[in-house]
């Protein structure tokens, strides 16, 4: 595995976990359900969903080197309109990639909706860039 790919995966996982932490905190403070059924918003379920999405996206990026390079370059840019424009241009030129990544992130989107977690794609990119900037 290339060092850049491993680093990108670690950053993506760190960002996804950071995005899920507020929801995990809420889930931990929430009262258990009366039925005793597994809580889909419990911290353990949030972590499983985040991990699953991160693994799927990492595998996808490994198998799509051009998209991996674009995403890596975006992580190295300053947070702002330029980085969003770079991604938008890539996705407009490659609608299948946009559709694939949307489908891969759908479990996280569903979790966000179901558990009222404020997670969006742009927030994830911004946090990934912030992590990248903090490590320089």
Curated annotation (Swiss-Prot):
A UniProt-annotated Pfam family: MHB
One annotated GO biological process: heme transport
Disulfide bridge positions per record: 41-115
Residues given in the record as heme binding sites: 60, 64, 90
Cellular component annotations (GO), alphabetically ordered: extracellular region
Signal peptide (residue range): 1-27
Keywords: Disulfide bond, Heme, Iron, Metal-binding, Secreted, Signal
Location(s), subcellular: Secreted
Result of altering residue 60 to F/H: Decrease in heme binding
Keyword flag Iron: yes
Main location as per UniProt: secreted
Highest taxon above the source species: Bacteria
Impact after mutating residue 90 to A: Decrease in heme binding. Strong decrease in heme binding
Gene3D superfamilies linked: Haemophore, haem-binding domain (1.20.20.20)
GO MF annotations, alphabetized: heme binding; metal ion binding
Function description: Part of a heme-iron acquisition system. Acts by binding heme and delivering it to the membrane proteins MmpL3 and MmpL11. Can use free heme or heme from host hemoglobin.
Quaternary organization: Dimer of dimers.
Name of the protein in question: Heme-binding protein Rv0203
Organism: Mycobacterium tuberculosis (strain ATCC 25618 / H37Rv)
